[in-house]
């Protein structure tokens, strides 16, 4: 983000305890307007607790939180949930829809609560505009019980954005969806971010979702910040074991470790590559030098915010000096090398 912007979310030294149990420990980070910010980590790492603190549903034991101009230093009696909800919306994995209300009525509800000054026609116009944006107009008179999981989540998103918030907090909103519905939700969230400038904070255990949508990622472990950076930086360059475990969970290290490799002449490498390198013949360029032989064990290409990035697991075979020269060539080509053995 541009340096001239102030953070729309600022978290400084936030800790939270429940009895003797530490839920969050000195968490600090900033989110800037227009970012799609991911929060990842294993179960129990503090992701949802942190998100609830950002929504002021939970309060930290210590530290400061500022979100869209509201902060936790305000006395409880002076904090206006109504005013806060005009600027910040929260979407959970459980949809939270009123079963007795139609799709239209569910989406109109926050407008009637937070914008009572709006006329009936103004409410209808804003609701139908939101329905059209999410391709839900044809279901406006349906009840939640008659909707698919993906449609319910779209309604939850519509209800969250109908008041035109500055920030939307998303808690595991694709966890119960099938792959096609997940892709659809990702596209809509990206569209929200790019066309309406809404800042998104996304908690997810689905790392593929994070790769596809997030510009920046906070990695949490046991309630603390393990690592923070752009999605590309963490995928390509991280040396952190927790980050690599999350970002490269599709690499079966145990299976690779069980393979036999001849001493001195073979080594296993992970090659990380980004953008234009994903479609170039980087392996063939190395093989053509005649320095080494290369066997490909595994590989994958993912879209990171519509830019291809991926990895290859290879066995590099040759004499020590030849392997060294081959690795130097790979680095010159822009490949990031991680050694297994």
Swiss-Prot record:
Compartment(s) where it occurs, according to its Swiss-Prot or TrEMBL record: Cell inner membrane
Domain ABC transporter residue range list: 9-247
**Where the protein is mainly located, per its record?**
membrane
What EC identifiers does the entry list?
Answer: 7.4.2.11
UniProt xrefs under CDD domains: ABC_MetN_methionine_transporter (cd03258)
User: So where does ATP get bound?
Assistant: 41-48
What is the enzyme's main class? translocase
* Annotated Gene Ontology cellular component terms: plasma membrane
Per its record, what are the GO molecular function terms?
ABC-type D-methionine transporter activity; ATP binding; ATP hydrolysis activity
Reactions catalysed according to its record: L-methionine(out) + ATP + H2O = L-methionine(in) + ADP + phosphate + H(+); D-methionine(out) + ATP + H2O = D-methionine(in) + ADP + phosphate + H(+)
State the InterPro entries in the record: AAA+_ATPase, ABC_transporter-like_ATP-bd, ABC_transporter-like_CS, ACT-like_dom_sf, MetN_ABC, MetN_ABC_transporter-like, NIL_domain, P-loop_NTPase
The family classification in the record reads:
Belongs to the ABC transporter superfamily. Methionine importer (TC 3.A.1.24) family.
Physiological role? Part of the ABC transporter complex MetNIQ involved in methionine import. Responsible for energy coupling to the transport system.
The entry describes its oligomerization and partners as: The complex is composed of two ATP-binding proteins (MetN), two transmembrane proteins (MetI) and a solute-binding protein (MetQ).
Protein name, entry field: Methionine import ATP-binding protein MetN
* Lineage, top ranks: Bacteria, Pseudomonadati, Chlamydiota, Chlamydiia, Chlamydiales
């Amino acid at each position: 983000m541009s340096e001239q912007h102030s953070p729309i979310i600022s978290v400084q030294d936030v800790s939270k305890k429940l009895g003797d149990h530490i839920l969050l420990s000195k968490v600090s980070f900033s989110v800037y307007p227009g970012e799609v910010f991911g929060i990842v980590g294993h179960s129990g790492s503090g992701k949802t607790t942190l998100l609830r603190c950002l929504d002021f549903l939970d309060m930290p034991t210590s530290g400061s939180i500022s979100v869209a101009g509201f902060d936790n230093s305000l006395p409880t009696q002076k904090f206006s949930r109504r005013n806060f909800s005009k600027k910040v919306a929260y979407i959970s994995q459980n949809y939270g829809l009123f079963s007795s209300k139609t799709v239209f009525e569910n989406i109109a509800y926050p407008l009637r609560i937070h914008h009572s000054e709006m006329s009936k026609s103004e409410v209808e116009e804003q609701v139908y505009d939101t329905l059209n944006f999410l391709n839900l107009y044809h279901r406006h008179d349906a009840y939640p019980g008659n909707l698919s999981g993906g449609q319910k989540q779209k309604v939850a998103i519509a209800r969250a954005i109908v008041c035109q918030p500055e920030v939307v907090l998303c808690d595991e909103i694709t966890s119960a969806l099938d792959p096609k519905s997940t892709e659809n939700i990702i596209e809509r969230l990206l569209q929200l971010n790019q066309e309406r400038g809404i800042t998104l904070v996304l908690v997810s255990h689905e790392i593929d979702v994070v790769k596809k949508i997030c510009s920046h990622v906070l990695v949490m472990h046991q309630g603390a910040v393990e690592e923070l950076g752009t999605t590309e930086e963490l995928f390509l360059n991280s040396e952190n074991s927790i980050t690599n475990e999350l970002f490269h969970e599709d690499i079966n290290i145990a299976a690779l470790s069980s393979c036999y490799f001849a001493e001195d002449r073979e080594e296993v490498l992970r090659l990380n590559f980004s953008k234009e390198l994903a479609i170039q013949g980087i392996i063939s360029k190395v093989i053509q030098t005649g320095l080494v032989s290369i066997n490909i064990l595994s590989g994958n290409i993912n879209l990171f915010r519509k830019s291809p990035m991926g990895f290859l697991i290879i066995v590099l075979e040759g004499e020590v000096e030849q392997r060294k020269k081959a690795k130097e060539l790979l680095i010159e080509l822009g490949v990031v090398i991680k050694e297994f053995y």
